[in-house]
Amino acid sequence: MKKLKLHGFNNLTKSLSFCIYDICYAKTAEERDGYIAYIDELYNANRLTEILTETCSIIGANILNIARQDYEPQGASVTILVSEEPVDPKLIDQTEHPGPLPETVVAHLDKSHICVHTYPESHPEGGLCTFRADIEVSTCGVISPLKALNYLIHQLESDIVTIDYRVRGFTRDINGMKHFIDHEINSIQNFMSDDMKSLYDMVDVNVYQENIFHTKMLLKEFDLKHYMFHTRPEELTAEERKVITDLLWKEMREIYYGRNIPAV
């Protein structure tokens, strides 16, 4: 897309929202409580603040204020207010390609708000536990929050991810013409690294004329030992392993498709 000469500030709002899910099976009530306590501590308000602070560096944001809170019995939230200084559009990379991974993050430039809320929960009887993190990165100006996508998914180990990206409002060029988007995008997947795309089955639902983009991701490989909490698969009978595998896989598909699947 040809670079635009704008009349004043870039008034477009770009919002990236996504849910990240981690799934686990805990055999006993004590193990379920242990998983909830473990995941609640792993992603407490301080850890989330560190992750979002790095996110600010990726999208080029100046932090104005940080509000964080751990909740009882579980859960946490962090909201960071950020500002954008005038940036020379010639210095901004608007091409459609993956953002940096955690080990390659560097600070540059400067951006509206970034927030995260966590929701640990468990099935009352079935041993299934899920951890959900809701994240929103919303910016005003020339820099896309999609640049933070790679980093956030890598930081929050994810079995299932649902992502929404939307560009709202309009900005004017020097001739007064309105522009409702200022960068090319065909799919959110184009902002992911090849190694990430190789790990997930993905599907897009995009409404191009409304500048709305949606991608769902489901981890391809299933290894039972990665989903057991304080129990090794070899400690179970073959029948128990099959029952637990079926439960986990059904749970993951229901979350991925957003609907309950009847038992066969």
UniProtKB/Swiss-Prot annotation:
GO cellular component, one term: cytosol
Protein name: S-adenosylmethionine decarboxylase proenzyme
Annotated organism of origin: Klebsiella pneumoniae subsp. pneumoniae (strain ATCC 700721 / MGH 78578)
Names of the cofactor(s): pyruvate
Known role: Catalyzes the decarboxylation of S-adenosylmethionine to S-adenosylmethioninamine (dcAdoMet), the propylamine donor required for the synthesis of the polyamines spermine and spermidine from the diamine putrescine.
List of residues that carry Pyruvic acid (Ser): S112
Cofactor note: Binds 1 pyruvoyl group covalently per subunit.
One BP term from GO: spermidine biosynthetic process
Disulfide bridge positions per record: none
Organism taxonomic ancestry: Bacteria, Pseudomonadati, Pseudomonadota, Gammaproteobacteria, Enterobacterales
Enzyme class name: lyase
